[in-house]
Amino acid sequence: MDEKQTPIGRRTWAVIVMLALVGQIAWAVENNFFNLFIQDAFGASLSDVALMVSASALTATLTTLLVGVWSDRVGRRKAFVVAGTLVWGFSICAFAVLQRVTGLLARDAAAASALGVALTIGFDCLMTFFGSLANDAAFNAWLTDITDDTNRGRVEGVNSAMPLLSMLVVFGGAMLLMRVADDGTVTYDYPIFFTVIGAIVIATGIAAALLMDESHPEARRGEGFLAELAYGFKLSSAAGNRPLYLVLAGYCVFACAMQVVMPYYVLYLRLPYILGESYVFVMAPCIIIASAFTILYGRRVDRLGFSATITLPLLLFVAGCALLTAFTAAPAVFIGSMLMLSGYLGSVACFSAAIRNHTPADRVGLSQGIRIFMVVLVPMLVGPWIGSAVSASSGVVGFGVVGDDFAPSSLIFAAGAAVSLFTFLVTWLIRRQEKAGA
């Protein structure tokens, strides 16, 4: 890995940071506040929330697969990013008027609640469609197009830090719109909140239209649309692209470990005998430290490559989970969280850069859909249930997205660490593959 690093211009860096951050802000709203909104506004049940999460995950996967192949066939990324981001923003703004619309259309409160739940789930899928079109499919394909194996570690160091940094932005902004009832119940001014977030996303789409350069991928010709879509799921494709699919398998295992922990992480910190409502004073600095570590570690990934850099963040993740399992004192929770989050983001940067390095140049769009299937859909269908199962002795078993009746146990961290150990087996296979191909 001694190649001269390919430079990335300032304007391109600005576009990367802007689209990555704002995209993750929008996803943070979808992943965290839609769940709260559907409960606060319409009294949704935990099963309603679970249905919404599952429907959204399936929508994201199918959209990324279909649009990824489409963008490969037409040889364009920018148009999808710009158009998708603009409509994505308007779809978020639509949530600002859902309560008013349901009140006007429904006959009574019960009908308004049922209609509100249905509309929220439907609009969540619509919002996810445009978000996945713009971000998961087109932006990530563009990011692969414009980078190479000399600078992808740096880019992924920045890109991988955005999901947690966006949580700080979203929750910090939401605190300004927080409403506390006389009985202590916390809710938010949702119309203003969704309008502001939607406007930010729309403005980002306009900025992308002005600043973003087309990556000009070569348009694919020959195969039919469905044949190209099926290509990524064939055993022959996995055999012909063994390094890519091994990295995807390793990322899938690690993402399952993360999904054992992360849906319950904030709920755990907020438990009165852990940190209570002061959890933000521990989580926020940990996120900043972990993000800084990942941005800097990305440079090391570029210099040394995947196999030489993946072990450290995996060990940090396991060590952090071990501390969080064994201790509940605030200093231990801080150190454990710092290690776990640093390991989480660092591992994601390593895996993401390696996936881009092994992605076939003529199937970049399709590969984004395969990535979402392997590292988002499958882990979301597996990990949360493991987390809820190990916590069953100390709380009501639930899907783990929201729910005040659910009390996660520290065993979620032990389970997450245990699942992550299987990642070491896959990384060993990756090293064997690299030696065999050398």
Where do the PLM segments sit?
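Structural signature of the two symmetry-related core transmembrane helices
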Residues: 79-94, 308-323
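Intracellular juxtamembrane helix-capping segments at the cytosolic ends
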Residues: 133-147, 346-360
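Helix-loop boundary and gating motifs at the non-cytosolic
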Residues: 2-57, 243-250, 254-273, 280
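A membrane-interface helix-boundary motif in multi-pass transporters
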Residues: 77, 110-112, 178-199, 389-419
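Multi-pass alpha-helical transporter architecture, strongest
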Residues: 96-100, 202-212, 409-438
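Helix-to-loop junctions at the C-terminal end of transmembrane segments
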Residues: 62-76, 293-306, 391
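Juxtamembrane intracellular "pre-TM" segments in multi-pass secondary transporters
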Residues: 1-10, 215-248
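Glycine-rich segments within core transmembrane alpha-helices of 12-TM secondary carriers
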Residues: 61, 153-178, 372-384
